[in-house]
Amino acid sequence: MTADTSSGDAAVAGASAGAEIHWFGGRFWGVSESLVGTLTPRISGEPDLHVGHFYGSQEASDLSEPDYEGLPQGASTSTHMLAGAVAGIMEHCLMFPIDCVKTRMQSLQPEPAARYRNVMDALWRIMRTEGIWRPIRGLNITAVGAGPAHALYFACYERLKKVLSDIIHPGANSHLANGAAGCVATLLHDAAMNPTEVVKQRMQMYNSPYRSVLDCMRCVWQREGALAFYRSYTTQLTMNVPFQALHFMTYEYLQELLNPQRHYNPSSHMVSGALAGAIAAAATTPLDVCKTLLNTQESLAVDSVSRSGRHITGLGHAFRTVYRLGGLPAYFKGVQARVIYQMPSTAISWSVYEFFKYMITKHQHEKRRIQRDAEK
């Protein structure tokens, strides 16, 4: 689908199953009607408009569009949930092979065949020795969990960010509010995502004994009980609360520098998301290593610390086990893969989220404008 701008107006023609997105002057020009209806994205040369501000005549005000950051009028909670769900699914699906490598590189006592030099070496060897589909084993359960988890995550964050900002720093952005909103949103996200993480990481491990996702879920339930799906929840929160607080504060700070008007700007969302993800990922890698150990209950690690084969339980137990088996360097196993995963992952997540939030909000505005015109 292409946009015809020869007369100075942008029109979206035809309908397609996907979206063909063209970058021009930092703007998206084409978008599938199947996703958000017949839309006219803003093009370079159009005036930047804010919520509650209109320029020119009444006709110009009818054609104006709200700033997509205008939460009360511009984007409802359902908009944030829909945009967040799509962003979460795309983020996890596109980056899943790297996530598989990260899980394996965090193994404390890997088999000789599962010792990798770097991310690319790991990907190549996994596909060559275990099959081309092995790096995406467990993708289905991840996609199922990522949708609702990210819907809650972004909707909660956007709502609390505004409420807390109005309390802490009325009329302006507050980094403290951003961090606090990110922490609370993480509680909901991890509650929905933690069982998925347990199954996913067990499917990703080298020589995983499970035939399928359902087989893994049944075995974990029968052998370890229902609580096994939340064994790493406190560790996950201990890792993700500071991760998301740092992530959101860094993202919002970079947005103030790169996009001070807070308009829809794909390049600034991508750069801010990538840098925020990289910084937060590197800082919280030790906690991620412990979370992986708690989720996978890596057999060699468990056997080496307990002859009885007792499960590793709790963050303190995991920290002691990691140090006993590998010393301080073990806390940063897989840091390269984690940063490589998080940079594009958060860039994709924020870019897709902001894109859909912008387009859905614009579509809602267009519908309201058409309704007003019909009533005249």
From Swiss-Prot:
InterPro entries under this entry?
Mitochondrial_sb/sol_carrier, Mt_carrier_dom_sf
Q: Which family does it belong to?
A: Belongs to the mitochondrial carrier (TC 2.A.29) family.
Describe its membrane topology.
Multi-pass membrane protein
Q: Which Pfam family name is an example for this entry?
A: Mito_carr
The stretches annotated as Solcar repeats are: 75-163, 173-257, 264-359
Where is this chain's protein located in or outside the cell? Mitochondrion inner membrane
Transmembrane helix among the record's keywords?
Answer: yes
Recorded source organism is Danio rerio (Zebrafish)
> What's a GO biological-process term for it?
iron import into the mitochondrion
Protein's gene: slc25a28
Query: What keywords does the record list, in alphabetical order?
Result: Ion transport, Iron, Iron transport, Membrane, Mitochondrion, Mitochondrion inner membrane, Repeat, Transmembrane, Transmembrane helix, Transport
Query: Which PROSITE patterns does this one have?
Result: SOLCAR
Catalysed reaction equations from the record: Fe(2+)(in) = Fe(2+)(out)
The UniProt entry's GO CC annotations, sorted and at most eight, read: mitochondrial inner membrane; mitochondrial membrane
What is the name of this protein?
Mitoferrin-2
